[in-house]
Amino acid sequence: MSNQIIRDHKRRLLVAKYELKRMHYKAICQDRNLPNKIRYEYFFKLSKLPRNSSKTRVRNRCIFTGRPRSVYKLFRISRIVFRELASKGSLIGINKSCW
């Protein structure tokens, strides 16, 4: 496994771990009915969470090659691997079209 795949997997685990806490803090920060002191306090708590626990830090990568671009979300594989597996018949329900 390449280092990028391992790093991305760790980020996904961190996102799952801190997801509820991050959503809670963000909701309090964005609530304008609360006093500013409380909002700033939770904004500070939000900034203390690990950076890699943010969803935007996760990169969709191919699970076979680690390729970061042109990855199908449904299969989590790149277009190149998808084409190889489809032509071999390894993907159930996917046929190479010919006309």
From Swiss-Prot:
Cellular localization per UniProt: Mitochondrion
Annotated family: Belongs to the universal ribosomal protein uS14 family.
InterPro entries per UniProt: Ribosomal_uS14 (IPR001209), Ribosomal_uS14_CS (IPR018271)
Predominant cellular place of this UniProt entry's protein: mitochondrion
Record's keyword terms, sorted: Mitochondrion, Ribonucleoprotein, Ribosomal protein
Entry's Gene Ontology molecular function annotations: structural constituent of ribosome
Gene Ontology cellular-component terms listed: mitochondrion; ribonucleoprotein complex; ribosome
Phylogenetic classification of the source organism: Eukaryota, Viridiplantae, Streptophyta, Embryophyta, Marchantiophyta
Native organism: Marchantia polymorpha (Common liverwort)
GO annotation terms (biological process): translation
Protein encoded by which gene: RPS14
Name of the protein in question: Small ribosomal subunit protein uS14m
